[in-house]
Design a protein with these regions (language model features):
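Conserved alpha-helix/loop element of class I SAM-dependent methyltransferases that forms part
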Residues: 29-48, 63
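Class I SAM-dependent methyltransferase SAM/SAH-binding core
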Residues: 49-108
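C-terminal alpha-helical "lid/dimerization" subdomain adjacent to the S-adenosyl-L-methionine
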Residues: 2-6, 10, 15-24, 28, ...
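A short glycine-rich, Lys/Arg-flanked "PGG" loop and its adjoining helix->strand segment in the class I
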Residues: 132-144
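A short SAM/SAH-binding and catalytic strip from SAM-dependent methyltransferases
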Residues: 118-131
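A generic alpha-to-beta junction signature in SAM-dependent methyltransferases
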Residues: 42-44, 67-68, 142
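A short acidic, Gly/Pro-enriched loop at the edge of an enzyme's catalytic core
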Residues: 107-118
Length: 208
């Protein structure tokens, strides 16, 4: 495996030196711009309880904390490298009791029913096993009327996804129609999918 492939194969589950490089890169550049774009499609109450699944380098947790200054944000990721980085980035909020980051999987969310006002998933659903079952888990931990936000770097419509899917084991880039279908099957309502024509970003929102 070449250097380029070694680095980007860490996108699914960052590990070791290249994993640390990956999570650092997740926190800036186009990833930051895309996250801000995606967040423009949801309102976050000042006292909201938020969960960020696949929290990566922790920058989106920090953005969410700023959006709900009287609320709390929890993060979960199955990469110990990502958990450690997210904890470092959000150390002050963790010390203040406004943030918690833990290791875990989107397939078995360790939270109570109806715990969160908002659940976010930035650049992560590509890797979720059994996508509809994972979505049902998200639905379970949301409060009635709570929102689910998905933000993906690729809308699956350009053909670029084939290159990444060959390079990154277990990756699937969902098209807008695929996401609508899976969210509907999982029990979500008020589903909206937005795309960015310039960058081919994708954002989906859905309600419980």
């Amino acid at each position: 495996m070449g250097l380029f492939s070694k680095i980007f194969s860490n996108a699914r589950k960052p590990e070791g030196f290249f994993g640390r490089m990956m999570v650092n890169g997740m926190n800036g550049g186009s990833h930051a711009r895309m996250a801000q774009w995606g967040l423009s499609f949801v309102d976050v109450a000042q006292e909201a309880g938020v969960l960020d699944i696949g929290c990566g380098g922790g920058a989106n947790i920090a953005r969410l904390l700023r959006r709900c200054p009287k609320g709390t944000v929890q993060g979960i990721d199955y990469s110990p490298v990502s958990v450690k980085k997210s904890q470092e980035v959000n150390a002050a909020a963790i010390a203040a009791g406004r943030c918690k980051v833990q290791e875990g999987s989107a397939a078995t969310l360790p939270y109570a029913d109806g715990e969160f006002d908002l659940v976010t998933a930035f650049e992560t659903v590509y890797f979720w096993p059994g996508i509809e079952e994972c979505f049902r888990g998200v639905l379970r931990v949301l409060k009635e009327g709570g929102r689910f936000l998905i933000v993906n770097e690729d809308d699956g419509l350009t053909g670029n996804n084939e290159k990444w899917e060959k390079m990154i084991d277990g990756m699937h880039t969902y098209t807008p129609d695929e996401l609508r279908t899976h969210l509907t099957a999982a029990g979500f309502r008020d589903i909206a999918v937005h795309t960015n024509d310039q960058h081919h970003w994708l954002c989906a929102t859905a309600a419980k």
